[in-house]
Amino acid sequence: MIDVTTDTTPLTGEQIREFVIAGHGNLEAVRALLAAEPRLLNAANEWGPGDTETAIQGAAHVGSREVAEYLLAQGAPLELMTAAMLGRRAVVEELLAADAAAIHSRGAHGIPLLCHAAFSGDAALVAALHEAGACEGNTMALANAVAVGARAVAVWLLENVDPDLAWTNWQGRTALDVAVARGDERMADLLRAYGAETS
């Protein structure tokens, strides 16, 4: 676990931004930056009014397990979105039992809980969260499941929540585009069976 120093020199916005960006999947950079400046661990970058994000929150919304696990080991807090992304069902249940309204909460950039849970590969967790009220973000949840090859989650979403198969992510790709780019023909065939087309 990182020992945060007593250094009182303020962190710069550039330091924080660089670390948070690294948190979106660049484990090597996260390790190096944190070794050089341990106070970055829970520092939040403000992207805009009301849109703040720490490195672990970045890891959670892109499904970067390695980065999230590393940051947790260094002492970052295990929040609901991260627990859902990692498939830590007992933690998710405990957090929701303590605050039932959190089922409607959103992570960084306003991304809904279901989208984080889709990365877990745990269809039962996704179904339970949806049943409990986490009904926003169905389409992005499918895209996230496809991005990590979480077939069981993709099947559940396709069968139960009618995601928009024409929706495109920030790269302009549909879920089918992502499956094809990954070389996941089984997933691509599943999506085509539900009417998906490439963009």
Predicted regions and their residues:
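Ankyrin-repeat boundary/"N-cap" motif
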Residues: 9-21, 42-58, 77-84, 105-116, ...
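Ankyrin repeat A-helix N-terminal signature
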Residues: 20-26, 54-64, 82-88, 116-122, ...
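Ankyrin-repeat and related helical/solenoid repeat scaffolds used for protein-protein interactions
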Residues: 139-182
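Ligand-binding grooves and catalytic loops that recognize ribose/phosphate and carbohydrate rings
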Residues: 107, 112-113, 119-128, 132
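The conserved C-terminal loop/turn that links adjacent ankyrin repeats
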Residues: 39-42, 77, 101-102, 133-135, ...
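N-terminal segments that cap or nucleate solenoid repeat domains
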Residues: 5-48, 87-105
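Ankyrin-repeat-protein effector appendages
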Residues: 2-20, 69-82, 98, 131-132, ...
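Ankyrin repeat structural motif
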Residues: 26-34, 64-72, 88-96, 122-130, ...
